[in-house]
Amino acid sequence: MALVRSLFVSNKILGGSLAGMRKSTSAPKGFLAVYVGESQKKQRYLVLVSYLSQPLFQDLLSKSEEEFGFDHPMGGLTIPCPEDTFLTVTSRIQG
């Protein structure tokens, strides 16, 4: 089972394994779907749930809480930052 060490553009999966993944609207076990962007059109990414305990990712979550509180317009976790910032943060977490 190969680990994904970079962004797969077609699936937008950060970290973790692609084994057994099917295209669906729900996130596979061990992953969390987040919506990223500052415009109305946000990109959906799947990140490992372990990212939730990372201080860099928690900073992004704090920004989301400040902007949206607990009322997320996308119906899921929305992170209001530029995609390149999000990708920089997640790449630092991946090591």
Curated annotation (Swiss-Prot):
Induction context: PIF4-dependent regulation by temperature. In low thermo-responsive cultivars (e.g. Col-0), higher expression at 28 degrees Celsius than at 22 degrees Celsius in petioles but not in leaf blades. In high thermo-responsive cultivars (e.g. cv. Alst-1 and cv. Ang-0) higher expression at 28 degrees Celsius than at 22 degrees Celsius in both petioles and leaf blades.
Changes seen on gene knockout: Reduced rosette weight and area at 22 degrees Celsius but not at 28 degrees Celsius.
GO CC entries: plasma membrane
Mode of membrane association: Peripheral membrane protein
Taxonomy, superkingdom: Eukaryota
UniProt record, GO biological process: auxin-activated signaling pathway; response to temperature stimulus
Keywords, sorted A to Z: Auxin signaling pathway, Cell membrane, Developmental protein, Growth regulation, Membrane
Tissues with expression: Higher expression in thermo-responsive cultivars (e.g. cv. Alst-1, cv. Ang-0 and cv. Com-0) than in low thermo-responsive cultivars (e.g. cv. Dja-1, cv. El-0 and cv. Kon).
Subcellular location: Cell membrane
Alphabetized InterPro entries for the sequence: SAUR_fam
Assembly mode: Interacts with PP2C-D1.
Family: Belongs to the ARG7 family.
Protein task: Functions as a positive effector of cell expansion through modulation of auxin transport. Involved in thermo-responsiveness of plant architecture. Enhances plasma membrane H(+)-ATPase.
Something else known: Exhibits a high natural sequence polymorphism between cultivars, thus conferring thermo-adaptation to environmental conditions.
The protein's name in its UniProt record: Auxin-responsive protein SAUR27
Species in which this protein is naturally found: Arabidopsis thaliana
